[in-house]
């Protein structure tokens, strides 16, 4: 009987050694897989951040270019209005000179009409220049908002990739632990497997199932 006990102890020790060896191999593989996943995640995050940075730079450059174009257009509009005002005033002056021989009343009316026309032209030019300036400001504001939203989206995407990688690592470790627990449950010695504190609820469930059969 003592020989049977010794033989049982030997088999139990041998089973435990094989189990520990297999557990170590599985944990090593899990750690290696987790390291590869983390490295891939870091690389992906770096690529995403670089792409976002490049996109932001391109958008900002485009915004600057559009703002410069709008500024040039506004300046051109203002210059054209100034030229038009000068031409109108000059034409009015010439008309006034030509009508000098007419009666004082007629001359006064023409001069007043010329002044009124010049004032209307100047006012229209100012209004057009103001509208062009406001449109340029609005366009620059919209472009800046788009740039900001693009940067925030790239950051959120990077955070999501890192979170998914973390979940993958956790799932891999849990899967390795469950596999070890199932191996212990099928080892033959149900009592010893149930007493192993590291196997958890999975080994206990397996032991119960084995006894029922």
Curated annotation (Swiss-Prot):
Residues 13-23, 41-74, 81-98, 109-140 have a biased composition (Basic and acidic residues). Residues 193-213 have a biased composition (Low complexity). Gene3D superfamilies: 6.10.140.1430. Residues 27-143 are annotated as: 11 X 11 AA tandem repeats of T-E-A-A-K-Q-K-A-A-E-T. It comes from the Eukaryota. GO terms for cellular component: nucleus. Residues 1-158, 182-213 are annotated as: Disordered. LEA 11-mer repeat repeats lie at residues 27-37, 38-48, 49-59, 60-70, 78-88, 89-99, 111-121, 122-132, 133-143. Keywords: Repeat. Induction: By abscisic acid (ABA). Belongs to the LEA type 4 family. This is ABA-inducible protein PHV A1.
